[in-house]
């Protein structure tokens, strides 16, 4: 199977997993990126069976609306049963690196609210140790140099992602060359740097379920 076919398979598996648990009052949290887009397209075939969605980015909101799915502001939603999103990397404990699409802060907020975080990814994203994929850090623009110096002290090699402004008006530093053996601790350390909005480690709140697309079919991993 191609990578696109694997993404479509895990997206459909996520729809199949949540659909029996949705009703006309249900609101679904939706992530950002190519795999999340596959999920949106698959979910749209059932748009009459649930109320609407909360989007983790402007791009996701536009795609949902394009399918005729109502999009709600998170502040107006009291209950979010599911959040479905892709990942750039996952370890066996379902700690994730996310943020390749620069939507990490809003993704982390929606994931924090949801009762169940379902990650959908192809098999190439499952790794023994996080860090081969550069770790994105969202930074207040005036703090870029300060944050970069602090990230070097933590053992990383930060690179400014040129030409990228987040939906929140901030910039991204991608931290290379980190072997992340304690993701919970590192997530906290980076977030404690003044000027950091958040970083792409999802370890304090990891995924609850990982639907992994493989050549043999979709495998389900749980934290």
UniProtKB/Swiss-Prot annotation:
InterPro entries: NagB/RpiA_transferase-like, Ribose5P_isomerase_typA_subgr, Ribose5P_isomerase_type_A. One of its GO terms (biological process) is D-ribose metabolic process. The active site is at residue 107. One of its GO terms (molecular function) is ribose-5-phosphate isomerase activity. The keyword Protein biosynthesis does not apply. GO terms for cellular component: cytosol. The keyword Isomerase applies. It catalyses: aldehydo-D-ribose 5-phosphate = D-ribulose 5-phosphate. Homodimer. This is Ribose-5-phosphate isomerase A. It comes from Pseudomonas fluorescens (strain ATCC BAA-477 / NRRL B-23932 / Pf-5). The gene is rpiA.
